[in-house]
Amino acid sequence: MASDDRPLALTLGDPSGIGPEIALAAWQLRGERGVPPFQLIGDPEFLEATAYRLGLSVPVAEVEPDDACEVFPRALPVLPLPSGAKVIATPGAPDSANAGAIVESITAAVDLVRSGAASAVVTNPIAKFVLTRVGFAHPGHTEFLAALAAREGREPPLPVMMIWSDTLAVVPVTIHVALRRVPELLTQDLVERTARIVHADLRARFGLEHPRLVLSGLNPHAGESGTMGTEDRDVLAPAVAVLRSEGIDIRGPLPADTLFHERARATYDVALTPTHDQALIPVKTLAFDEGVNVTLGLPFVRTSPDHGTAFDIAGKGIAKPDSLIAALRLAHRLAHRPADTVLPFPVRA
């Protein structure tokens, strides 16, 4: 299969959430919204039943990996789970009985990309509590994908979560951890490694020749010279100094409360923040329906919608597919970007 003909591999996500219905909606809008060919890895009968229940005119076709692009114009290609597992799910009622299928879909998507049968992985939302009940040991999707990406006998790569939109791109240095643990986890080494990966992937994946980064402070006023906490002075500032000595264009630590207004955003390409919510609050405020989660640092392209399972609205036919469509489109563009082009990024000054 020629590389340009490879479809995206879309995971099932939690079948009790909105993932299946936004996948169906994305296929319906394929022409109108320029959705690239994708195959969903799951249970074809479940997807067919979901479409029927929602009153969607979406034909579902069971496919082999090589058939997806040929089938995509006329039906939603669904690749059965390798185990042949069937999915039984009630919208809004997460069930650990589906944990195996959820994990198997993710693993199969990565295997498709690594074998060359798919160009990139796009993941539908999962609920970690559903998986931890059956022994899932990873903090989230991002960390699990890093483990899958590890070569045998080697440590998993450091996965970096970037939330991208046309308005703002952000990277939390610490991800799915309790706030009280951030000071112990926020080391100079972690900041440096994260920034290096962001810098390298902006160049390699997005085609930005000279990426501009900023780092927000952890404490109010970026610590104000140590009077409001010492992490900014003793951890973040030294990390920035080392990175700048390596030729990376990064500024900081800067007060987080003045980092995300329009004029400030025009001065950088990506903002790194010490905590998860420092990054996600501004980007979800500015681009709630259009944000895309891009995992940097992996040997393959992975994107996902910037929202969760939304169990509260699952099955009601009101979930918007916008973020999933943005994730599919960005994954395709990243996987197929010509070497001499630059992908659109938040507006530069």
Curated annotation (Swiss-Prot):
Location of the protein in the cell: Cytoplasm
Under which name does UniProt file this protein? 4-hydroxythreonine-4-phosphate dehydrogenase
Recorded source organism is Methylorubrum extorquens (strain PA1)
Give the residues the record marks as binding substrate. Answer: H141, T142, K284, N293, R302
Q: How does it assemble?
A: Homodimer.
| Family matches, as NCBIfam families | pdxA (TIGR00557), PRK05312.1 (NF003699)
Family named by the database record = Belongs to the PdxA family.
Summarizing the function annotation, the protein's role is: Catalyzes the NAD(P)-dependent oxidation of 4-(phosphooxy)-L-threonine (HTP) into 2-amino-3-oxo-4-(phosphooxy)butyric acid which spontaneously decarboxylates to form 3-amino-2-oxopropyl phosphate (AHAP).
Record's cofactor remark: Binds 1 divalent metal cation per subunit. Can use ions such as Zn(2+), Mg(2+) or Co(2+).
Instruction: Give the pathway annotation.
Output: Cofactor biosynthesis; pyridoxine 5'-phosphate biosynthesis; pyridoxine 5'-phosphate from D-erythrose 4-phosphate: step 4/5
Q: Does the keyword Zinc apply?
A: yes
